[in-house]
Regions:
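S-adenosyl-L-methionine
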Residues: 1-37, 247
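Hydrophobic "anchor" residues on beta-strands that sit immediately upstream
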Residues: 21, 42, 152
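Anionic group-transfer/hydrolysis microenvironments
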Residues: 27, 48, 158
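Short, polar loop motifs at secondary-structure junctions
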Residues: 27-32, 125, 191-197
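Short loop/helix-cap segments at secondary-structure boundaries that form the rim of catalytic
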Residues: 34-39, 145-149, 195-203
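Class I S-adenosyl-L-methionine-dependent methyltransferase module
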Residues: 40-137
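Active-site segment flanking the S-adenosylmethionine/decSAM binding pocket
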Residues: 135-171
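Long, positively charged, glycine-interspersed low-complexity recognition regions
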Residues: 167-247
Length: 247
């Protein structure tokens, strides 16, 4: 699987399980939540065309296509592979570095020497996911334009503090408007942030170490979870909405 800045790959198991048949990720990125529950009806949405194109490529790709990508070793130079399509170059750019917000243009020997098996592991991960995502719907777009429907909404936007590194960054987000939008969703709503955020009443779920510091991941949800505190239960977080399956 490819690495992406802000991915929930290490902590996805701590988020509430989906209670609806459909999952919608309006800020999809590497879509680790949907991958965990891949058999669901999944809609991925992202404004960043590079990410959407990579997902479309993977949806169409075969194992042969993935294995046909150039071998990546310590001397790998992406610029020499001029025959690759733009989307293949971008996919490889996310394979040869960790937690990037845009595809890397080159592999560093230091990174590779410290992680000699990582590329092979990621290639295997890509092959494993190919049959899992054939039924998904993937579109380029913005959350504001999505139909409100009964679903598990896994909302992981660029963070209020720290989300400036994305190509489609937090600078273009009105967080008050986003908060109201999240509260109005039908079904189950799970919103990701860290504890510095102020635009919803987030509460912590796990503390984790980043490259240079610790941070605490938090969530807001319209369903009761094991992370709820007594104070939050007393003050409430709005109306609870049950999932409704519509034929």
């Amino acid at each position: 699987m490819f690495s992406y800045y802000g991915s929930k790959s290490k902590i996805v198991q701590y988020y509430p399980s989906p209670t609806c048949d459909k999952i919608i990720e309006p800020f999809a990125g590497s879509a680790r939540y949907s991958l965990r529950y891949f058999e669901k009806d999944v809609l991925l949405v992202d404004k960043y065309k590079v990410i959407v194109d990579i997902w479309h490529y993977l949806q169409r790709a075969s194992e042969k296509d993935i294995l046909g990508l150039p071998k990546i070793d310590i001397d790998f130079d992406l610029s020499k592979h001029v025959y690759l399509s733009e989307v293949e170059k971008n996919l490889i750019g996310f394979l040869i570095a960790d937690a990037q917000s845009a595809p890397s243009k080159k592999l560093t020997k230091k990174w590779f020497s410290l992680r000699p098996a990582k590329i092979e592991h990621r290639i295997k991960g890509l092959i494993d996911l190919l049959p899992k995502i054939k039924h998904w719907k993937i579109i380029q777009g913005s959350y504001e334009n999505l139909k409100n429907e009964n679903a598990t909404w896994f909302i992981d936007p660029p963070y209020q503090f720290g989300g400036e590194h994305y190509k489609e960054s937090n600078k273009n987000i009105d967080f008050n408007s986003l908060a109201n939008w999240c509260k109005s969703r039908l079904g189950q709503v799970i919103v990701c942030e860290n504890t510095n955020a102020t635009w919803l009443d987030f509460y912590p779920i796990i503390r984790m170490k980043g490259a240079n510091k610790f941070s605490t991941e938090s969530i807001w949800t319209n369903f009761k979870t094991q992370y709820d505190s007594i104070q939050q239960d007393l003050f409430g977080r709005g109306n609870k909405k049950e999932c409704v399956n519509v034929a």
